[in-house]
């Protein structure tokens, strides 16, 4: 099942879940997450897609953090049909990315040093500044957990706690950014070549998600072939696919024969296809580098297969 029952004779409550370094980081996550969410909901305020994303990210991270701390403290994680080490490592990395994004977006769109006009006034400004500070602290709390639980070189660990496993979460997150730019009037349907790039992004994203799900559910040991070898082969193919997209997408979007080499002067901000194409191109190279790093690290990892 991928989970491990606690040995008999131990207490029902595990105090180390809140007193250990990792436990302390998780308690701080709850404190900072609840404070940030409360400040924004009470007087800070939010609006639009950006504000909704921030609140959703904080709410999601807080809810799962409560689940993790509760299961660790009561030892109920041993009853779950999943690999607990893989689950907590994957969630900590995802929460780090989400909280980092929200910690950048909220101050950028909602925080100003000058007081807004009434009825909001300086009170709303102060709440937004405080929420921005606690959002940054929340990111640091999740990043601390990732640093504390990451597998060290030569250490036998769950796959998602290795650098390769953590990179899988980052790759999927970057792919979501690419998808967001694609659907925002990127005009990817004009050429078969750019449609091929979309297929590459989708295929690699789905394969990465499958690897993460298999690890979290604890089914990496019954695939008929070694899981680490399968991951290396997939990562190598992903590097080749992303390499093709890294060449094709800029050519068909920014070459004068097919697209615009520079941003059109009459292109409106916030709804300019060229901007979306630039975002896709930039994060294509980011993900290519992530897959190359993943391939390099996956050559030397050792992790515990789960059944």
UniProtKB/Swiss-Prot annotation:
Keywords recorded for this protein, A-Z: Membrane, Repeat, Transmembrane, Transmembrane helix
Q: Looking at the record's lineage, which domain of life comes first?
A: Eukaryota
Q: Which Gene Ontology cellular component terms are annotated?
A: membrane
Show which residues constitute the signal peptide.
none
Q: Assign the protein's first listed, main location to one coarse class.
A: membrane
Name its cellular compartments: Membrane
The chain's coiled-coil residues are none
**Family assignment from sequence similarity:** Belongs to the MAL family.
Mind telling me what this protein is named? Myeloid-associated differentiation marker-like protein 2
Task: Give the classification, highest ranks.
Answer: Eukaryota, Metazoa, Chordata, Craniata, Vertebrata
């Amino acid at each position: 099942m991928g989970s491990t029952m606690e040995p008999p004779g131990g207490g029902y409550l595990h105090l180390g879940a809140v007193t250990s370094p990792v436990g302390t980081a998780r308690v701080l996550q709850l404190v900072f997450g609840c404070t940030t969410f409360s400040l924004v909901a009470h007087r800070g305020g939010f609006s639009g897609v950006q504000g909704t994303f921030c609140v959703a990210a904080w709410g999601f991270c807080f809810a799962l953090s409560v689940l993790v701390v509760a299961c660790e403290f009561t030892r109920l994680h041993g009853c779950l049909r999943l690999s607990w080490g893989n689950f907590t490592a994957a969630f900590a990395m995802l929460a780090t990315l989400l909280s980092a994004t929200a910690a950048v977006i909220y101050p950028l769109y909602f925080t100003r040093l000058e007081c807004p006009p009434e009825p909001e006034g300086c009170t709303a400004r102060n709440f937004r500044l405080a929420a921005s500070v606690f959002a940054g602290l929340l990111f640091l709390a999740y990043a601390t957990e990732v640093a504390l639980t990451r597998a060290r070189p030569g250490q036998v660990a769950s796959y998602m706690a290795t650098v390769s496993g953590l990179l899988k979460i980052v790759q999927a997150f970057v792919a979501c950014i690419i998808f967001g730019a694609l659907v925002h009037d990127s005009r990817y349907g004009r050429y078969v070549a750019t449609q091929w790039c979309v297929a590459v992004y989708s295929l690699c994203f789905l394969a990465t998600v499958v690897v993460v799900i298999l690890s979290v559910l604890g089914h990496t040991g019954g695939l008929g072939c070694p899981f680490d070898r399968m991951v290396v082969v997939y990562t190598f193919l992903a590097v080749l696919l992303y390499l093709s997209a890294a060449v094709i997408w800029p050519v068909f979007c920014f070459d004068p024969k097919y697209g615009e080499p520079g941003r059109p002067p009459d292109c409106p901000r916030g709804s300019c296809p060229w901007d979306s194409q630039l975002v896709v191109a930039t994060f294509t190279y980011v993900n290519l580098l992530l897959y190359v790093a993943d391939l390099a690290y996956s050559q030397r990892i050792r992790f515990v297969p789960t059944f």
